[in-house]
């Protein structure tokens, strides 16, 4: 079900101290937006209504967090949830930011200087209706290569999903993008790790009897990347001289 337009969302976000109003202007300087810029930076890609971010960020004031989603009508809900969580913890929200961004264009908003130590991807769109849409998955190699550019070797990506096909495909995506899977489970709640924070979606799927799949992947050296963009692969496979060299000019 599509979420209705919320006319109050943008004005309320613009009045929020931890909302990044012009995210396109901060490439190379994201750390400077925080009260303690030398702290590690962790991203949640597709933060949705903020159920995960609002739990995690107040627990770790020694880490800076950025929650990203594409629309204000979703982000406004995250803003309110984060505010309530910090108020309950009696803490200032000075280690958390939220921003409206298209994650598929992340490389145009961040630079390698914006060192990201960890990324969380929780219950993202599986894009499973047809094979051509798979490239939009947040765990597809073309996306993972964007994240790699921001992350030092050894940094980690935490991924959770209810979708079987997305998870199985992701088990191939991560290694192809040079990310070693160091831990995985097809039933997160069977032996739930202490670090897991259940989101609204997670609770809903669990109540329906749908197992939650999860993994942790660690960025390896650039030499471990095996995936090649299809257009680039075609270029590499084309004989020297192009089509003329392959079979001559017809006609």
Regions found by a protein language model. Name each.
Residues 46-50:
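Class I SAM-dependent methyltransferase "Motif I" SAM/SAH-binding loop
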Residues 80-113:
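S-adenosyl-L-methionine
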Residues 75-77, 167:
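Short alpha-helix immediately C-terminal to the canonical SAM-binding loop
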Residues 154-161:
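Conserved beta-strand signature within the Rossmann-like core of class I S-adenosyl-L-methionine
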Residues 1-38, 181-251:
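SAM/dcSAM-binding transferase cores
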Residues 138-153:
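A short glycine-rich, Lys/Arg-flanked "PGG" loop and its adjoining helix->strand segment in the class I
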Residues 71:
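Conserved SAM/SAH-binding beta-strand->alpha-helix loop
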């Amino acid at each position: 079900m599509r979420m209705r337009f919320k006319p109050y969302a943008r004005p309320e976000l613009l009045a929020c101290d931890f909302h990044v109003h012009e995210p396109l202007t901060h490439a190379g300087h994201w750390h400077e937006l925080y009260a303690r810029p030398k702290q590690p930076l962790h991203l949640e890609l597709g933060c949705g209504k903020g159920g995960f971010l609002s739990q995690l960020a107040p627990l770790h004031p020694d880490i800076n967090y950025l929650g990203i989603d594409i629309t204000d009508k979703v982000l406004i809900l995250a803003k309110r949830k984060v505010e309530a969580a910090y108020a309950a913890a009696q803490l200032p929200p000075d280690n958390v930011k939220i921003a409206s961004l298209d994650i598929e264009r992340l490389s145009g908003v961040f630079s390698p200087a914006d060192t990201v130590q960890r990324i969380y991807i929780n219950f993202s769109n599986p894009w499973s209706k047809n094979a051509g849409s798979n490239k939009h998955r947040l765990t597809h190699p073309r996306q993972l290569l964007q994240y790699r550019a921001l992350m030092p070797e050894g940094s980690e990506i935490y991924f959770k999903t209810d979708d079987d096909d997305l998870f199985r495909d992701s088990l191939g995506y991560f290694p192809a993008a040079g990310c070693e899977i160091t831990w995985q489970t097809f039933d997160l709640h069977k032996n739930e790790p202490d670090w897991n924070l259940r989101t609204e979606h997670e609770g809903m799927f669990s109540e329906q009897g749908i197992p939650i799949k999860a993994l942790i992947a660690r960025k390896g050296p650039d030499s471990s990347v095996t995936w090649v963009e299809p257009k680039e692969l075609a270029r590499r496979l084309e004989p020297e001289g192009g089509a003329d060299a392959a079979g001559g000019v017809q006609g």
